[in-house]
From Swiss-Prot:
Plays an essential role in the inhibition of host apoptosis. Mediates host mitochondria-mediated apoptosis through interaction with the mitochondrial antiviral signaling protein/MAVS and thereby promotes viral persistence in host central nervous system. Within the host nucleus, regulates viral RNA synthesis and polymerase complex assembly. Residues 18-87 are annotated as: Disordered. InterPro entries: BDV_P10. Its main location: host cell. It holds the Pfam family BDV_P10. Phosphorylated. It comes from Borna disease virus (strain V) (BDV). This is X protein. It is found in: Host nucleus; Host mitochondrion. Residues 36-48 have a biased composition (Low complexity).
Length: 87
């Protein structure tokens, strides 16, 4: 990526964020847009209910008992296939 294009992308990001610099010029109308801020207040409440440990709802249940894990997820292939690596 050329340095001119990199500078142009950086300038675009700065303008979108409201952080325009002297080198990048001014926004039309001579006004600079302030960065987005959260105007409302945010509160955090402590709850005592629920499990003591973190549980990921997207995770699969733990297996019951020892299970052998495959070394890889690929199908077994014959060793004499065309283009096979020589071991």
């Amino acid at each position: 990526m050329s340095s001119d294009l990199r500078l142009t992308l950086l300038e675009l990001v700065r303008r979108l964020n409201g952080n325009a610099t002297i080198e990048s010029g001014r926004l039309p109308g001579g006004r600079r847009r302030s960065p987005d801020t959260t105007t409302g207040t945010t509160g955090v409440t402590k709850t005592t209910e629920g499990p003591k440990e973190c549980i990921d709802p997207t995770s699969r249940p733990a297996p019951e008992g020892p299970q052998e894990e495959p070394l890889h997820d690929l199908r077994p292939r014959p060793a004499n296939r065309k283009g096979a690596a020589v071991e």
